[in-house]
Amino acid sequence: IIGRLVGSEMCIRDRPLLYYALSNLIRAGVREVLFISQKKDISKFRKLFGSGKQLNMKFSYTFQKKQVGIPDAINIAKKFINKKPFVLALADNLFIGKSFTSTLKKVQSVKEGAAVLAVKTKYPSKSAVIEYDRQKNIKSIIEKPKNPKSNLTIPGLYFYDKDSISVVKNLKPSKRKELEIVDVHQSYLRKNLLKVFELKKDVQWFDTGDAEEMLEASNYIHKYQKKEKKLFGSIEMDSYLNGWITRKQLRTLINQMPNSKYKEKLSALA
């Protein structure tokens, strides 16, 4: 699930911002995706991604009627979830690094409860902060604390079991009159059903909802692609590398693209 109010026209480097979030899910082996956005953007998303058949995936689309918080995405997606574990991804969160995919696969081995990622950051007060006790057990999770007790924050990629639906159902709105994702995590924590997976040092996280971080992400992606000689955030290439589409199908997709730098880079690698 990609749940965030992100316009389809928002781009980083030479492709839509949503490509990066979707690329991470593809590399993690996710084949069914529900896009949740504003009603006005749904037709744009459909035009951009279609049914998913071209990538041997399945895409569905729906919208959030009213902005009442991130956990509302779980309410909206009840039928899609269908009593199965799922991923809730915020489309404006970018993760770049070699070890990221292997970490995602470890997280997906968790079948009961919830799992979150943790990343060390210079500005922890911008996000939910994790505090451990001496035994490395989670002591607390506090949303945007004024005086953070650690530099470990939770980025926007969450893993839940089917019980998250009842958890969200029992949530009460915060002072902002919204449902808070940190309350979902605290509910699992109280039951000792929340696991944390720390990202390795090679993984960079960017919250591109911040204009400055979007610029930083763009520059970092440029350097990363140049150094690794790989195309980062390519849903077509990632689907091919997963074995979901053939080289012939990949080339057909490339030929159907309008002329762009992205098409040139993808053609060179295919």
Question: What are these model-predicted stretches?
Answer:
Residues 1-7, 12:
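Single conserved hydrophobic/aromatic residue that forms the stacking wall/gate
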Residues 15-104, 210, 252, 256, ...:
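Conserved N-terminal catalytic core of the sugar/cofactor nucleotidyltransferase
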Residues 34-35, 88, 114-117, 196:
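Structural beta-sheet core signal
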Residues 66-70, 123-125, 147, 204-205:
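A short acidic, often aromatic-flanked loop/helix-cap motif at beta-alpha or helix-coil junctions
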Residues 87, 101, 108, 137-244, ...:
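Catalytic-core segments of class I nucleotidyltransferases/pyrophosphorylases
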Residues 92-95, 119-123, 135-136, 146-147, ...:
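Short acidic/polar capping segments at secondary-structure boundaries
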Residues 97-125:
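Conserved donor-nucleotide/metal-binding helix-loop-beta segment in metal-dependent transferases, i.e.
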Residues 130-132:
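A structural signal for short hydrophobic beta-strand segments in well-ordered beta-sheet cores
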